[in-house]
Amino acid sequence: AYQDITIPFQLSSVEFFTEVQRHLKPNGVMVVNLNMTSAENGSINEYLCDTMASVFKYTVTAPVKGNTNTEVFCTDADDWEETFLRSIGNLTDCDYADMMRTVHEKLTPYEGGACILTDDKAPVEVLGMRVLDELIGDELKYYKDELKTGGLSALLGG
Protein backbone atom coordinates (compact mmCIF):
# COMPACT_ATOMS: atom_id res chain seq x y z
CA ALA A 1 0.00 0.00 0.00
CA TYR A 2 2.90 2.33 0.74
CA GLN A 3 6.69 2.23 0.96
CA ASP A 4 7.47 4.69 3.74
CA ILE A 5 8.53 3.78 7.27
CA THR A 6 5.29 5.13 8.74
CA ILE A 7 1.72 4.74 7.60
CA PRO A 8 0.37 7.72 5.63
CA PHE A 9 -1.90 9.78 7.88
CA GLN A 10 -4.82 9.45 5.48
CA LEU A 11 -4.74 5.65 5.98
CA SER A 12 -4.79 5.88 9.78
CA SER A 13 -7.79 8.01 10.71
CA VAL A 14 -11.29 7.37 12.02
CA GLU A 15 -12.56 8.67 8.71
CA PHE A 16 -10.49 6.13 6.74
CA PHE A 17 -11.45 3.15 8.91
CA THR A 18 -15.10 4.21 8.76
CA GLU A 19 -14.86 4.18 4.96
CA VAL A 20 -13.30 0.69 5.07
CA GLN A 21 -16.10 -0.45 7.39
CA ARG A 22 -18.71 0.79 4.90
CA HIS A 23 -17.12 -1.29 2.13
CA LEU A 24 -17.05 -4.55 4.11
CA LYS A 25 -19.73 -7.19 3.80
CA PRO A 26 -21.95 -7.50 6.91
CA ASN A 27 -19.62 -10.02 8.60
CA GLY A 28 -16.46 -8.88 6.84
CA VAL A 29 -13.12 -8.47 8.57
CA MET A 30 -10.46 -5.82 8.13
CA VAL A 31 -6.93 -7.11 8.79
CA VAL A 32 -4.05 -4.70 9.39
CA ASN A 33 -0.40 -5.65 9.73
CA LEU A 34 1.32 -3.30 12.17
CA ASN A 35 5.05 -3.37 11.69
CA MET A 36 7.34 -1.88 14.35
CA THR A 37 5.23 -2.95 17.35
CA SER A 38 5.64 -1.02 20.58
CA ALA A 39 4.11 -1.60 24.00
CA GLU A 40 4.82 1.97 25.13
CA ASN A 41 1.91 4.15 26.22
CA GLY A 42 1.08 6.68 23.53
CA SER A 43 2.79 4.65 20.79
CA ILE A 44 1.62 4.60 17.19
CA ASN A 45 0.32 1.07 17.84
CA GLU A 46 -1.89 2.32 20.66
CA TYR A 47 -3.15 5.19 18.51
CA LEU A 48 -3.91 2.93 15.54
CA CYS A 49 -5.59 0.24 17.65
CA ASP A 50 -7.61 2.78 19.65
CA THR A 51 -8.70 4.40 16.40
CA MET A 52 -9.75 1.10 14.83
CA ALA A 53 -11.52 0.03 18.03
CA SER A 54 -13.49 3.30 18.00
CA VAL A 55 -14.94 2.33 14.61
CA PHE A 56 -15.40 -1.45 14.84
CA LYS A 57 -17.38 -3.43 17.42
CA TYR A 58 -14.59 -6.02 17.81
CA THR A 59 -10.85 -5.46 17.58
CA VAL A 60 -8.42 -8.29 18.37
CA THR A 61 -4.65 -8.49 18.02
CA ALA A 62 -2.13 -11.28 17.50
CA PRO A 63 1.65 -10.92 17.71
CA VAL A 64 3.68 -12.34 14.83
CA LYS A 65 6.38 -14.72 16.04
CA GLY A 66 9.96 -13.80 15.23
CA ASN A 67 9.55 -10.13 14.30
CA THR A 68 8.13 -6.81 15.41
CA ASN A 69 4.76 -7.19 13.68
CA THR A 70 1.28 -7.43 15.15
CA GLU A 71 -1.82 -8.45 13.19
CA VAL A 72 -5.01 -6.55 14.00
CA PHE A 73 -8.42 -7.98 13.09
CA CYS A 74 -11.49 -5.70 13.15
CA THR A 75 -15.12 -6.61 12.52
CA ASP A 76 -18.69 -5.81 13.51
CA ALA A 77 -19.76 -9.47 13.29
CA ASP A 78 -20.95 -10.84 16.65
CA ASP A 79 -20.11 -14.39 15.54
CA TRP A 80 -16.59 -13.55 14.29
CA GLU A 81 -14.84 -16.14 16.45
CA GLU A 82 -17.15 -19.00 15.52
CA THR A 83 -16.79 -18.03 11.85
CA PHE A 84 -13.00 -17.91 12.21
CA LEU A 85 -12.89 -21.40 13.77
CA ARG A 86 -15.32 -22.82 11.20
CA SER A 87 -13.19 -21.37 8.39
CA ILE A 88 -10.09 -23.03 9.84
CA GLY A 89 -11.97 -26.33 9.90
CA ASN A 90 -12.77 -25.94 6.20
CA LEU A 91 -9.13 -25.48 5.16
CA THR A 92 -7.59 -28.32 3.15
CA ASP A 93 -3.97 -27.17 3.50
CA CYS A 94 -2.86 -28.67 6.86
CA ASP A 95 0.09 -26.31 7.32
CA TYR A 96 -2.10 -23.27 6.70
CA ALA A 97 -4.76 -24.62 9.07
CA ASP A 98 -2.12 -25.17 11.79
CA MET A 99 -0.83 -21.63 11.33
CA MET A 100 -4.35 -20.20 11.61
CA ARG A 101 -4.98 -22.25 14.78
CA THR A 102 -1.81 -20.71 16.23
CA VAL A 103 -3.09 -17.25 15.27
CA HIS A 104 -6.42 -18.01 16.96
CA GLU A 105 -4.67 -19.10 20.17
CA LYS A 106 -2.79 -15.79 20.29
CA LEU A 107 -5.77 -13.53 19.61
CA THR A 108 -6.25 -10.95 22.34
CA PRO A 109 -9.32 -8.71 22.55
CA TYR A 110 -8.34 -5.05 22.35
CA GLU A 111 -10.10 -2.50 24.52
CA GLY A 112 -10.01 0.85 22.80
CA GLY A 113 -8.86 3.98 24.57
CA ALA A 114 -8.72 7.70 23.96
CA CYS A 115 -5.77 7.85 21.53
CA ILE A 116 -7.75 8.58 18.37
CA LEU A 117 -6.35 9.66 15.01
CA THR A 118 -8.49 11.85 12.75
CA ASP A 119 -8.01 13.50 9.38
CA ASP A 120 -7.39 16.71 11.33
CA LYS A 121 -4.99 15.18 13.87
CA ALA A 122 -2.82 12.23 12.88
CA PRO A 123 0.85 12.71 13.85
CA VAL A 124 1.82 9.29 12.49
CA GLU A 125 5.31 10.36 11.39
CA VAL A 126 6.26 11.49 14.91
CA LEU A 127 4.66 8.42 16.50
CA GLY A 128 6.34 6.10 14.00
CA MET A 129 9.75 7.66 14.57
CA ARG A 130 9.35 7.09 18.33
CA VAL A 131 8.88 3.36 17.73
CA LEU A 132 11.84 3.29 15.36
CA ASP A 133 13.98 5.03 17.99
CA GLU A 134 12.81 2.45 20.56
CA LEU A 135 13.73 -0.47 18.27
CA ILE A 136 17.16 1.01 17.50
CA GLY A 137 17.72 1.62 21.23
CA ASP A 138 16.92 -2.03 21.99
CA GLU A 139 19.40 -3.19 19.35
CA LEU A 140 22.09 -0.82 20.62
CA LYS A 141 21.57 -2.09 24.17
CA TYR A 142 22.31 -5.62 23.00
CA TYR A 143 25.60 -4.57 21.41
CA LYS A 144 26.58 -2.40 24.38
CA ASP A 145 25.98 -5.32 26.74
CA GLU A 146 28.01 -7.66 24.51
CA LEU A 147 30.85 -5.16 24.43
CA LYS A 148 30.78 -4.76 28.24
CA THR A 149 30.73 -8.47 29.00
CA GLY A 150 32.88 -9.92 26.23
CA GLY A 151 34.84 -7.02 24.82
CA LEU A 152 35.43 -6.35 21.17
CA SER A 153 36.13 -10.01 20.44
CA ALA A 154 32.55 -10.89 21.51
CA LEU A 155 31.19 -8.49 18.90
CA LEU A 156 33.51 -9.82 16.23
CA GLY A 157 32.59 -13.43 16.98
CA GLY A 158 35.94 -14.34 18.47
What are these regions (language model features)?
Residues 1, 35, 64:
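An acidic- and aromatic-residue-enriched active-site/binding cleft used to recognize and process polar
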Residues 1-11, 38:
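A short SAM/SAH-binding and catalytic strip from SAM-dependent methyltransferases
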Residues 10, 14, 42, 46, ...:
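Non-membrane alpha-helical structural segments and their capping/turn regions in soluble enzymes
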Residues 12-26:
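A short glycine-rich, Lys/Arg-flanked "PGG" loop and its adjoining helix->strand segment in the class I
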Residues 17-18, 42-63:
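Conserved Class I S-adenosyl-L-methionine
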Residues 27-34:
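Conserved beta-strand signature within the Rossmann-like core of class I S-adenosyl-L-methionine
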Residues 34-36, 78:
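A mature extracytoplasmic/lumenal domain signature
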Residues 58-158:
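Soluble small-group transferase modules, centered on the S-adenosyl donor enzyme superfamily
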